[in-house]
Amino acid sequence: MTVSLDGDYYVRFIVRNVESSAGRRHGLVYSLTLHGPDKGILGFDNAHPVPPRKRDEPHDHLHVGDTVKPYDYTNAGALLQDFWTAVYSLLHERGLT
């Protein structure tokens, strides 16, 4: 699902159920992203492990610009809240809220 925000900004959600595994213990593959006029700005996803995590540890992580760091997934509600909090913070920094 893609939702247009203000001007050239939009968010995209891709979520699907999968069998639970070491990397996706909650049984979801997800990608929640904020895009701007030139590129992706923010993303929460679990497509792959992120150092220092190993392949058999949770794949959940956060991208802010070119920085990637582990994200501590607790539940879907907290993920959505954390995502929207980060979106509004970044849009505010850019003078869009």
Ranges and model annotations:
Residues 18, 35, 49, 64-66, ...:
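Short linear sequence elements within intrinsically disordered, low-complexity coil regions
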Residues 1-58:
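The feature represents the first ordered module of a protein
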Residues 67-97:
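Short, compact, well-ordered microdomains
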Residues 52, 61-64, 96:
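Solvent-exposed, non-transmembrane amphipathic alpha-helical segments
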Residues 57-71:
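Short helix/strand-capping connector loops at secondary-structure junctions
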